[in-house]
Amino acid sequence: MPIFVNTVYCKNILALYTTKKFKTIIEAIGGNIIVNSTILKKLSPYFRTHLRQKYTKNKDPVTRVCLDLDIHSLTSIVIYSYTGKVYIDSHNVVNLLRASILTSVEFIIYTCINFILRDFRKEYCIECYMMGIEYGLSNLLCHTKDFITKHFLELEDDIIDNFDYLSMKLILESDELNVPDEDYVVDFVIKWYMRRRNRLGNLLLLIKNVIRSNYLSPRGIHNVKWILDCNIIFHCDKQPRKSYKYPFIEYPMNMDQIIDIFHMCTSTHVGEVVYLIGGWMNNEIHNNAIAVNYISNNWIPIPPMNSPRLYASGIPANNKLYVVGGLPNPTSVERWFHGDAAWVNMPSLLKPRCNPAVASINNVIYVMGGHSETDTTTEYLLPNHDQWQFGPSTYYPHYKSCALVFGRRLFLVGRNAEFYCESSNTWTLIDDPIYPRDNPELIIVDNKLLLIGGFYRGSYIDTIEVYNNRTYSWNIWDGMEW
């Protein structure tokens, strides 16, 4: 066990032994100890006050006092008072620091703090942080605050169980707070409020003081509006936190510039939020992702995927965002959504696929094409299942087709066209598009199914086609009522 010596105190300690000795029995937490009260009274004002003998006619040669200190820490302080030496290790340092603060023994206070800072450990960072706030120990507070913000996800439960409003605010307002996105902070504050049963006023103050609303998803904004019971959220112009700040995005940067960075990315959308996933950046495939809200014209952070991806496909289902296939791992699948700490790897596809057509009906994910120009297989993943299964084969190969659910049917369109009916578990042929296409898109406008874009034999197809539900055929759409 390391020994620390106060050399100045040691020089003066001999003089204390020449004074009259008074024995005192101290009843502490966990045991008793007999001390020379004369020496202890010289150690600090705390002991001078608490060991003062009551003046009575019949003085007891041995007095008794009760102190709210644990016996082990008190013993260390008593030994220091006799010898000028204190024994400190990782097992006793926190309790000894608290006891030395209560007893105003400055040498032990600063020795304990220096020991903690040199040999800092996660297991006592929460208690040290709270002592830093309670007793105004600035160097201990700064060090523990930095550690907690960087290891926030690991310490989340301990923070919820122990922190009050002030302790929480100092952490959550930090630029260094290590969170995957701002929705995570909103979810955490709600969780803290529910578990600790804090006053509603504390919750409202935290939300207003620490949340960076300009980086919230619609889901996060909805939660904040629910908490504040308002229709319009407060404006915030703070910079993004360092943990979700993109190194390749300069601030400020408009949405068009951000979209240009995500070259050859996968895209999908949920409501007004478009998700840009993977692609080609700096001459390599990357694992970055970002969300763009085209209504509020702001970007929303997304943590990096577990795998880099090019020519993947994305689909929202089960309140999550799924990314399927693509290079360099064409069978891999992962999922995430706002507020999640990280992407989660999902069961692998049965066949490798690039740019497959994907769609979801009743939270069942269907994957078609993307394997080869002759492949007609389909796969599906049921909610909460851990394995993909083959579904009914399509009539045509759909190597570069697209898919969309319209009118409770899953349409699969490219050079050929057909739709899937979940209730009958069958595919039905419909007329091929007037202009066959590779990599087109299906969209719904005014309750009409439109086929747009795509290439055929190296040429871009600029003609838009609209589906006729009565004749199972396609017509040229000119933007007028049809």
From Swiss-Prot:
InterPro entries: BACK (IPR011705), BTB/POZ_dom (IPR000210), Kelch-typ_b-propeller (IPR015915), Kelch_1 (IPR006652), SKP1/BTB/POZ_sf (IPR011333). It holds the Pfam family Kelch_1. The keyword Repeat applies. Induction: Expressed in the early phase of the viral replicative cycle. Residues 125-222 form the BACK domain. Kelch repeats lie at residues 273-319, 320-363, 365-408, 410-447, 448-482. Residues 20-90 form the BTB domain. Keywords: Kelch repeat, Repeat. It comes from the Viruses. Might have a role in the suppression of host immune response. Belongs to the orthopoxvirus OPG047 family. This is Immune evasion protein OPG047. The gene is OPG047.
